[in-house]
UniProtKB/Swiss-Prot annotation:
Keywords: Chaperone, Cytoplasm. Heterohexamer of two alpha and four beta subunits. InterPro entries: PFD_beta-like, PfdB, Prefoldin. The lineage of its organism: Archaea, Methanobacteriati, Methanobacteriota, Stenosarchaea group, Methanomicrobia. Pfam families: Prefoldin_2 (PF01920). This is Prefoldin subunit beta. GO terms for cellular component: cytoplasm; prefoldin complex. Molecular chaperone capable of stabilizing a range of proteins. Seems to fulfill an ATP-independent, HSP70-like function in archaeal de novo protein folding. GO terms for molecular function: protein folding chaperone; unfolded protein binding. Belongs to the prefoldin subunit beta family.
C-alpha cells in the first residue's frame, strides 16, 4: 500500500465506501420488495374473505379489528409507498453503480500506468 500514491489510496477508500453504500441500498431494496410481496399476498387472501368477516390488523404492538375495506386500503397504501421507495432505491443503486464503475476504472488506469516499466526514451 506504501507504493500506491496518496490520490489512489483516497480513491480506494472512496471505492470501499461506495461499495458499502451500494450493499446497503441493495439490502434495503430487497427488504422493501419482500414486504411488498407479503402485502400483495395479504390483499389476494382478503379477496376471498366476505365483506362482513372479522379482519384483524397489527397497529403497532396491538392487534385491532378493522373492516375489510380499511385493511385493504391500508395494505394498498403501504404497497404504493414501498413501490415508490423501491424506485428511488433503484435510481440510487444505478447512480452508485455508475460512479463505482467509473472510479474502479480510474483506479485500474492509475495502477496500470504506475506498474508499466518505463519505455524507451
Amino acid at each position: 500500500m506504501e507504493n500506491i500514491p496518496p490520490k489512489v489510496q483516497n480513491q480506494l477508500a472512496m471505492l470501499q465506501q461506495m461499495q458499502q453504500q451500494l450493499q446497503t441500498v441493495v439490502s434495503q431494496k430487497g427488504q422493501y420488495e419482500l414486504t411488498i410481496r407479503e402485502a400483495r399476498r395479504a390483499v389476494e387472501d382478503l379477496a376471498d374473505v366476505p365483506e362482513d368477516a372479522a379482519v384483524f390488523m397489527n397497529v403497532g404492538s396491538v392487534m385491532m379489528q378493522k373492516s375489510k375495506e380499511q385493511v385493504l386500503a391500508s395494505l394498498n397504501e403501504r404497497i404504493e409507498t414501498l413501490e415508490l421507495r423501491v424506485k428511488s432505491l433503484e435510481k440510487q443503486e444505478k447512480a452508485l453503480q455508475g460512479r463505482f464503475e467509473q472510479l474502479s476504472s480510474q483506479i485500474r488506469g492509475a495502477l496500470e500506468g504506475k506498474q508499466q516499466p518505463p519505455g524507451p526514451a
